């Protein structure tokens, strides 16, 4: 078996996968039509709770849905909405302390009533799961071939030889190169994307009728994410399984789901076909969730509308509709009576909202009045009119690491070229985003900037000072105040033993500020990042993810830096919280004339709040320029592949646009090609004439400017 290559999708060439809802294939609640096939999985009144010191945590409250053969149900919602608890309940993987009620019917059998022994005979055979973290699903001391062989032999009467042959075929099916040899390798010898392919192979090994994928692409680059989603779709088609796809990425849902269930506070609040839900959401929560999503597919910079407030605690849910405290169109009845999940007249699908009929009739906007949410859009035109001074200048930056072998007596066997000749400038009031796959050198570049030491090669200048000229610790400390960092995970960045006040006071005290100065500065910092001053007395554990990230930003701003380095500042946040933080960063940049150097993998977010982009691959910048220029007219084939892999939260456009799926894995930076670093994966190289192909193999391309004279620059022989 071999992995079928990806192909463009469009009206004449529809993408793979099950049929979409339509007259002959109705979605949920679509009304009269041909009889639907019997569901392979039916969930009825599913309830999951966990004990806690404050009382029972109601994680899942009365969830109902049917999963049809060959179709994909996407489950979306904020953290804590009950998505993962639902997935674990389906698989029978809830912890022993959890309390489960309701029915989970698979082929007429109630999984909720089974003990672990009976469930073990069903898991992996009739229902398979793709986990978020592939390493948690793979035994590190067994080769991947042996893992697959064992999964096959547990449920089938196979000899070791036959099981091994089927394991090799499964690896081939999910796109593992040289599957017979790679079957002998161990999980740690695979990249993250390759490990996820192995997990998918495990999930489909026995051709289950149901697959459950819980955030299967969360930690992956966009190019690898696109590959994994294609593999998952192919696996579903090969096995004929129905798929439950749990994700926070609405673009992934738009491109791969047939039906969508939106969860909030432990229950489904809207359930409809994917086209209907994205085109005309009926539940106010769904409408606000979609309004908070940035999109990379359009040059129109609409404002992001974050959802006000925080999700309710599952220990103390409010009376009535759980979303009422955050809803812009809530009425008194919404605060006293919880609505049932019903189908409004004239609309497909089901929704739990007292005002659903008004929304369905078009007499009420589910997102509320235009002024009900504060939203900002970047003023790039103003930034171009008033360019600030250069805050950071990097020229020909080089960073290498030794490659060693041996446990005790290490010997050097090679050199890993992490960053090679990188150069850029960042001005006051400007955001430069470094984008690219993992291993491209983005984070190493950030670390070299933050070291404030002479680099291995090249030059780094911060606030007009060449870091190579710093001779004393006092000079370094003085320059350190000009550049600060906001880390990816605010939980890891904040000392859990300190209150917010002490966390913000720490950098001020380290700089020698007295008690009076500290006490006057901290309230202003909290105001600056939009936090109530009462938060100062709390510990990080008592804050939401968005609040913790705001504290991290306030801490970085404590000493009034000119440059903020942001390392994936949004990847650990829900989409609604992400919109709040994006809007905050845009406002702070404008008000304080800050310069931002950002590393991010979400190109939709990058498009929203960056002014310029530098695309990195294997330690080299292969293309750079103004954000809108890069998105509108990408030149380098790697940039084109990156942009084509970004999911769009629009089912029609997402399923019809052409994709460029890169072949193979990014090569090791310890063995760089002699010519272009992208040559082994470049689609243009495969189509070029022999003279260009020879140059690509033997000569490193120089960076050239676009013909229009703009600052758009790229390095490619084939253009």
Where are the model-predicted features located?
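P-loop NTP-binding/switch modules centered on Walker-like glycine-rich loops
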Residues: 78, 92, 212, 216, ...
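Helix-to-loop junction immediately C-terminal to a conserved catalytic motif
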Residues: 91-92, 450
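Conserved ABC transporter NBD signature motif
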Residues: 99-110, 458-469, 479
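ABC ATPase NBD coupling module
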Residues: 111-128, 154, 160, 276-281, ...
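Conserved catalytic motifs of ABC-family nucleotide-binding domains
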Residues: 207, 560
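Charged, flexible cofactor/metal-binding loops and thiol motifs
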Residues: 53, 273-390, 404, 408-410, ...
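Conserved ABC ATPase "signature" region
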Residues: 110, 162-181, 290, 466, ...
